[in-house]
From Swiss-Prot:
It comes from Mycobacterium tuberculosis (strain ATCC 25618 / H37Rv). Residues 1-26 are annotated as: Disordered. InterPro entries: DNA-bd_HTH_TetR-type_CS, Homeodomain-like_sf, HTH-type_TetR-like_transc_reg, HTH_TetR. Transmembrane segments: none annotated. Keywords: DNA-binding, Repeat, Transcription, Transcription regulation. This is Uncharacterized HTH-type transcriptional regulator Rv0767c. Pfam families: TetR_N.
Amino acid sequence: MSSDVLVTTPAQRQTEPHAEAVSRNRRQQATFRKVLAAAMATLREKSYADLTVRLVAARAKVAPATAYTYFSSKNHLIAEVYLDLVRQVPCVTDVNVPMPIRVTSSLRHLALVVADEPEIGAACTAALLDGGADPAVRAVRDRIGAEIHRRITSAIGPGADPGTVFALEMAFFGALVQAGSGTFTYHEIADRLGYVVGLILAGANEPSTGGSE
């Protein structure tokens, strides 16, 4: 008997388009990653001002139109580079480590993602600040904020106080702006963040003085 499939079952009809979609998504993801890697390599050689999506596309060996399919602008591309770096930072959740140390360690790791490549850090800061009017950049900023929020709440643990988390987020992003502008190095802000984290967490643990006398 021939092994050729002459009739496609309903299950096969449902599976085959799904398989095509999965394959297509994998190809798209591979292209996305390739352009991101090319952007990182280009930023090591070119300044923020000199980088263009076309230049990165040429390095990634993809058509400019393909690169623009994934990244609407230079700022969008660089913002995605920073988001990718943030996502590589592990969550610090070891319950055997005191909570303040977990939080400090988490923010320190996040602060140092571009510490050894200040030109990339400066480009990321410029893209995130200058691209505020770009909806694609705003969306990436929101995702970066969500990643930072998740790591802070994970480090604090169950029942993290929203006000404390917000204060830590504000301290972290303020520190990044100072490093990106060159006021401090990334290593310096990482050290200073440890002190600020201590103050915020100590204040959060102080008993409230409110209430009637």
